[in-house]
């Protein structure tokens, strides 16, 4: 169902040393990934080309759902100081997984791949992700399992009473409260979507 292929763009570099990076025009610290090896590596790829970068737009659950409908995806993972700017002319999307910098894009590609793959029909049960955090711009409600009491920490009574209408209302309220506390930006996004 899912096939993952790793393409080392060093295999597409010229010269004995197969150099994929070089100094920055105009000066500056660090090395930039060169355009030629990445362009050559991309020539035989299919589907949407995705650049992973802290400069990209924030990756969301909606993006994962959109990507899950694609037949093929190619993730371009950076290293060093970043990419030659012209590489952005070769891509379809540029995503960031957060406001921080990693040593390379490999971890970001795994995060995006995992969140996307789980939404492909047949990978997990649809019910398993329909109520996930972010599905309705809300975080998930608190969930509990046995035992009902552990070291004086109790499962809320409403979850034990069997009244499905009350349980649903409790879950909606708690999801809203958790989102308001931890991610108020999602509440604002939900309100703006109306």
UniProtKB/Swiss-Prot annotation:
Q: Which family does it belong to?
A: Belongs to the RNA methyltransferase TrmD family.
Oligomeric state and interaction partners are given as:
Homodimer.
Gene Ontology cellular component terms for the protein in this record: cytosol
In terms of domain of life, where is this protein from? Bacteria
Question: What NCBIfam families does UniProt report for this protein, alphabetically?
Answer: PRK00026.1, trmD
Q: Which residues bind S-adenosyl-L-methionine?
A: 78, 97-102
Q: Which reaction does it catalyse?
A: guanosine(37) in tRNA + S-adenosyl-L-methionine = N(1)-methylguanosine(37) in tRNA + S-adenosyl-L-homocysteine + H(+)
The record ties this protein, via HAMAP family, to:
TrmD (MF_00605)
Gene Ontology molecular function, alphabetical? tRNA (guanine(37)-N1)-methyltransferase activity
Q: Where in the cell is it found?
A: Cytoplasm
Cystine bridges: none
Question: What is the first-listed, main subcellular location in coarse terms?
Answer: cytoplasm
Organism annotation: Mycoplasma mobile (strain ATCC 43663 / 163K / NCTC 11711)
The record's function comment reads: Specifically methylates guanosine-37 in various tRNAs.
Q: What is this protein called?
A: tRNA (guanine-N(1)-)-methyltransferase
Which CDD domains does the annotation name? TrmD-like
What does the UniProt keyword field contain? Cytoplasm, Methyltransferase, S-adenosyl-L-methionine, Transferase, tRNA processing
Indicate whether Disulfide bond appears among the record's keywords: no
EC number(s) on file: 2.1.1.228
Q: What class of enzyme is it?
A: transferase
Kindly list the biological process annotations in GO that this record carries. tRNA N1-guanine methylation
